[in-house]
Amino acid sequence: MTATTDRGLPGAPCWVSLLTGDLPAAQEFYGAVMGWSFRPGTLGEDFSVALMDGKPVAGIGNVARSMGVAVSWTSYFAVEDADTVAARIRERGATVAVGPLSVGHGRAALAADPAGAVFGFWEGETLREWSIGHRGAPAWLELRTRDAFASAIFYGEVFEWATGRPDRCEVRYEDDAVMVRGQGHTVACLRGGGIEAAPDPQIRPRWHVYFCVDDVEKAVEAALAAGGTVAAAPHDSWVGREASLRDCEGGLFTVTGARG
């Protein structure tokens, strides 16, 4: 991490990272589509940090093959004690797949919730200037899952959401979705079927990362030209214009014209 760090709000998203199998190809793709530049990461030659206007946006790690996982964008949540969080995850029938491991000046782990959605958590300092919807960071994080209410209970218990503590995230139920708020703004959304509806078996649970672009259609054209594919064509959603894309190795992400 850089000198501008703090411990982060426990339970709130603190970073996103692409697990890729080809770092140079990933940098070329996202440079073309998102206009990012890159600098070496602090974890070795297999890692880099994506920058927008000189500000950190996301991490890229050339570790998908060595870890035996799919190429994917992963959302990380800040925690005070990685071992405690790992125990809570296991106690609730979910999986801690990797870690917690010492990484740089902190500890990281990868897990999957009971529905199979992969997420990470991080114990250590976080970038102070990185916050959902601000300064080039992702505009939005959304868990698409079969049962949003059940997922809210799981994550709420694991990350201590909705405990009434001022140093924790709060939860609101709006328009059949679970909105997670921290320090005065929305940091994540959990969306599935209706809150009281039966789970939707057609949904493949996953955390989706939304990146803001000036022009969704141009981003789609750039992705296709760079060897990516379109998972969902440009359309108007509840947050604005958006499209879902896969990079040249299949990593799924969404571009949106909405500013957080």
What does each model-found stretch correspond to?
Residues 1-8, 12-21, 49, 64-88, 94-143, 165-183, 191-193, ...:
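Vicinal oxygen chelate
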Residues 2-3, 7-10, 14-55, 91, ...:
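Core segments of cupin and vicinal oxygen chelate
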Residues 41-132:
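Active-site-adjacent scaffolding segments
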Residues 56, 66, 186-187, 196:
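Active-site/binding-pocket entry motifs
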Residues 58-61, 188-192:
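Short amphipathic beta-strand/extended segments with alternating polar/hydrophobic composition
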